[in-house]
């Protein structure tokens, strides 16, 4: 089985070493590893670091340099040039790492059943705090219903797509942030069979300087968040759009600009775990309901 790992990087030469080392420790006879480093216009020493690694590792490590266009442009670049040749494809940010044995666990799973998408839990790291995030309830394994497949934890880390699913994904927007949420939501919508693994597949470094979560709340960030919410609603994932409104600064600007988001159905949290369902229902009723309105369709 061949696995393609896409590493999106921009001026992260000091951090990408850990990401690459985590792949070295994941090598297994069950998997042929192909690593594609897509440099989104860095001006640091990323190229030199990758060149040194290419001489040391036993797996395929390719480096591509492109003009800066943000995260969505990296995925578009890989798809347009058909760079990922693995049976399974995943995306790893340059400041994140895979947990040991993740690829071996994946290989054992997909050998036994025909899945389109395998979703691991992950560990959220912030300063000295490490917290395991359960992407789905611990007892959920196989998801087929559309609303059941939704998850508010929509980073690409630990999500492995079959190659044909990856290349079916719609083109992402470029030169804007937060396209990873749309990437994940589109993957979940198109996947027929989703398998959840109740095991952390990697470490996600939250609010690292320079990543999208550390961007200040200016008009550009507000517009990007608003567009993502509208796109998620179009994907019938309005419950995930609602999660974006948990950010206070986003709500403040929506209120100032008197913006409401149109939805075409009532909110349904039945696909979430009971504790997430209770929390989202409560905050929707008490805080967030005012930011949405039900748009009736004409007969």
From Swiss-Prot:
The keyword Glycosyltransferase applies. Its EC number is 2.4.-.-. It holds the Pfam family Glycos_transf_2. Disulfide bonds: none annotated. GO terms for molecular function: glycosyltransferase activity. Keywords: Glycosyltransferase, Transferase. Signal peptide: none annotated. CDD domains: Glyco_tranf_GTA_type. It comes from the Bacteria. PANTHER family: GLYCOSYLTRANSFERASE, GLYCOSYLTRANSFERASE 2-LIKE DOMAIN-CONTAINING PROTEIN. Belongs to the glycosyltransferase 2 family. This is Uncharacterized glycosyltransferase MG060 homolog. The lineage of its organism: Bacteria, Bacillati, Mycoplasmatota, Mycoplasmoidales, Mycoplasmoidaceae.
